[in-house]
Amino acid sequence: MNNIKVFVLMAGLTGLVVAIGQALGGGQGAILALLLSAGMNLFMYWGSSSMVLRSYGAQVVTAQDAPELYEMVDRLRQRAGLPMPTVAIAPQDQPNAFATGRNPENSVVCVTQGIMRALSKDELEGVIAHELAHIKNRDMLLQTIAATMAGAVSNLAQFAFFFGGRSDDDDGVHPVAGIAMLIIGPIVAMVIQFAISRQREFKADAVGAEISGRPLSLANALLKLESGARRIPMQVSPSAATLAIVNPLAAFSMRGISKWMSTHPPTAERVAALQALAA
């Protein structure tokens, strides 16, 4: 099912890019945009995880670099029946974590330095199990491509605003329609991305609790992580932020923002679901 969603996302990205190209350059713009989208789709499949790691400033570590973390990931991935993922650490004070990669054989589990200081061993195990659940559920490619897609469409729209569109004399999309498309395109991409992220987090919480055997430890971790994210800002692209276990941009979020524009489901709802599992 996730493979179908990945195909739909890539097709949607292609359609958005071609539509923007048509708005900016007519038929020639559409052709160039089609070629560009083909390159973007190939990059998203093969290289999006590297881009996400760079966005967080993360570095891959070995068992010699971080023995306790490496052993924890190894033990939990065996319990989940997964191959050993690459382990990475992001030099961020905010406590957070995420998983990325195109499949279980090419996956990465990344934690921040802040999370290793903020959580107990049981709580950190709960978080690692949550990220391994994303890998087990094959969420990473879908979420990583959604993140990259939203960022790519937003960047293309910014480029279009800087360099301008077509004149009234040219054939094709009217300038007003083109401007509307440039505004709506990134919003649509972000809403799709947010919806995917929220949907997959609940399932990863449940599967992660099953892997670790400690749903309450994950619930406690989520409360600590949300508190930390609100107190400690993190500089990361909004598109990559959806991959994290809690919203790393919570410190910048506007109060009263509607649920459908939130990158993550409400932590209180996630905690309640985990408490129900433990009951």
Swiss-Prot record:
Q: How is the cofactor bound?
A: Binds 1 zinc ion per subunit.
Which chain regions cross the lipid bilayer?
Answer: 6-26, 29-49, 145-165, 176-196
Cofactor(s) for this UniProt protein: Zn(2+)
- Binding positions for Zn(2+) per the UniProt entry: 130, 134, 201
In its UniProt record, which GO terms are filed under biological process?
A: proteolysis
State a GO cellular component annotated for this protein: plasma membrane
Q: Where in the cell is it found?
A: Cell inner membrane
**One GO molecular-function annotation for this sequence?**
metalloendopeptidase activity
Q: Catalytic residues? A: 131
Q: Which domain of life is it from?
A: Bacteria
Membrane topology per the entry is: Multi-pass membrane protein
Tell me its EC number(s), please.
Answer: 3.4.24.-
Write down the top EC class of this protein.
Answer: hydrolase
Q: Which UniProt keywords apply?
A: Cell inner membrane, Cell membrane, Hydrolase, Membrane, Metal-binding, Metalloprotease, Protease, Transmembrane, Transmembrane helix, Zinc
CDD domains this protein is in?
A: M48B_HtpX_like
The UniProt similarity line reads: Belongs to the peptidase M48B family.
Task: Write the protein's name.
Answer: Protease HtpX homolog
Gene, per the UniProt record? htpX
